[in-house]
Amino acid sequence: PVALQAQEFDASQGVTWQDMNDDAVDVVLDHIATVDARASAIETAAGLDDLNRAFIEPAAAALAEKINRDGLKLYQDIPYVVGTGGTAPSSLSDLSDVRRALNLNRAPLTGRVAVWDAEADAKLTQLPAVVNAEKAGSAEALREGSLGRVYGIDHYMSQGVWKHACGLTAAEAVKVSDAVSEGATKLSIDGTKLTGRLVRGDVLKIGGRSYVVTEDSAAAASNAIGGVSVYPALPALADNAEVTVVGGHTANLAFHPMAFAYVTRPLANPD
């Protein structure tokens, strides 16, 4: 969206014009989701109702599931994390932490959404503040098993939520191995024990901020990994700054829908 700034008007200087630049992002449409099925001549001669039941409906469901999984896999591009890896959220404070992260990252207040895996959903739908109608104002969570809207976020469950496996097999006393200049998007790390490699979607915490690894790194050699690509850009970091590697975790997502775009177009007609 166009971003403008409000300023104090100075009659002696007059109007200060701002350009209304609407940023654009190039999107490469290079993925085609397909459901291929083989049918005999007798099967293709079946009535339309049978064709719907045997192919069209299950094919549509398979495509929807793939699109859902592909969308949830965008967690690999998100650096902002809360909670403890390997521990399902189970309290109102966990939900409050999610809201805080959205607030700090200036997500619009309306339309916020969270998608939880089955384990987190089971924990959160047991919260007394959600289940008890006299507290929540509704018995929907108890009757329908739906968390609903809590802390300004619409909550949903999906079996398609990904489980992220950290690429490192050992990481002890990890630190920045060379000073980093402000604005850099690469850094090198070492530790007393560092094996494996960092993979896309791994998260590093440095100086109270978190950064996501944007591409697989080289394998660790002599307890060090160089040229690790991360997002967002780094501040100036001193050599030996402490690094916390977030371990394997379930990649539940909380976001505003405008954070992502689903882009599609009709297939070209065959000649």
Question: Which residue ranges define each predicted feature?
Answer:
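Assembly/oligomerization interface modules of large self-assembling protein complexes
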Residues: P1-I32
